[in-house]
Amino acid sequence: MAKKVQALIKLQVAAGAANPSPPVGPALGQHGVNIMEFCKAFNAKTDSLEKGAPVPVVITVYSDRSFTFETKTPPASFLLKKAAGIKSGSGRPNTDKVGTVTTAQLEEIVKTKEPDLTAGSLEAAVRTIAGSARSMGLVVED
């Protein structure tokens, strides 16, 4: 018989830097999950990613206090900021442009995010990421 799901927890944790302090500790502690076990497993799984990159994770907690987790790819905004070499996006993206990204950079980002994107084709995915770039105040160049 399948285990009964007790909770579904969504967090964003820095790659390789999960520790019992907030936000991880309180979120898992209230469901009785072994926090250190999660931290060790998460850090081992995100070892190959860039240190400090925010990684969305979905943790499924079962009624016997066991858990499974699935990591996603870093947010598009993080990847776009890294590609453009900026610290943050524009507060007024329509008037203040803060950087530029090329179509080649967008395609690299799409390849990174491919498992999490629902776009039907590469071109559609590039258009999606280009829209995110424009909403951050980045100029998209061919």
UniProtKB/Swiss-Prot annotation:
GO cellular component, one term: cytosolic large ribosomal subunit
Post-translational modification: One or more lysine residues are methylated.
Listed GO biological process terms: translation
A single MF term (Gene Ontology): large ribosomal subunit rRNA binding
Superkingdom in the source lineage: Bacteria
Keywords: Methylation, Ribonucleoprotein, Ribosomal protein, RNA-binding, rRNA-binding
Cross-referenced SUPFAM superfamilies: Ribosomal L11/L12e N-terminal domain, Ribosomal protein L11, C-terminal domain
Any Pfam family hit: Ribosomal_L11
Subunit structure: Part of the ribosomal stalk of the 50S ribosomal subunit. Interacts with L10 and the large rRNA to form the base of the stalk. L10 forms an elongated spine to which L12 dimers bind in a sequential fashion forming a multimeric L10(L12)X complex.
Family to which the UniProt record says this protein belongs: Belongs to the universal ribosomal protein uL11 family.
Role summary: Forms part of the ribosomal stalk which helps the ribosome interact with GTP-bound translation factors.
Protein known as: Large ribosomal subunit protein uL11
Organism: Colwellia psychrerythraea (strain 34H / ATCC BAA-681)
Lineage summary: Bacteria, Pseudomonadati, Pseudomonadota, Gammaproteobacteria, Alteromonadales
